Amino acid sequence: DERAPVLIVGPCGTGKSHLAQALGHCAVRQGQDVVFASCAQLLASLNAARAIGNYERKLQQLARVPLLIIDDFGLKPLRAPADEDLHDLIAERYEQAATVVTSNLDFTEWDQAFPGNRLLASATVDRLRHNAYCLTLDGASYRAPRQGPNKAKTTLASTPKNNHS
């Protein structure tokens, strides 16, 4: 029931989408509505709604869903009007509904997803990062060919403990 964003980053194949889907399944089990879409699919649906005069209705529909999972943010650079659409959606959901975002980009690179508008990038990313749970996954790709008994392993980055010897 918490509305804080969950941001999951890491290289390709480390389980970001899988983890996001697991969060979605947990929400569904608790009776919540969930929408899972790639960033490109989400923005294409908003663009299609604009073309038939239903942009505001579609935006509000996505803004109200209790959990929105946006997969592969930053995979492609956002150009107008997609950059504005994503900002509008994030602004509508800000502190109102839970959003999970996955990305291959490191958190420090998220503004690069908005190459044409640094101010819009800053405003959007700032809303996403505010009170967010930030997870960084690392490891070999689960999709890579496997040799022998070794399995690809993903680790969650953590701060090393201080050893007081």
What is each stretch, according to the model?
Residues 3-19:
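Walker A/P-loop nucleotide-binding motif
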Residues 5-7, 33, 67:
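Residue-level preference for the first positions of well-ordered beta-strands
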Residues 13-18, 27, 77, 142:
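Short, flexible micro-motifs
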Residues 25-37:
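Post-Walker A helix-loop "phosphate-sensing" segment adjacent to the P-loop in P-loop NTPases
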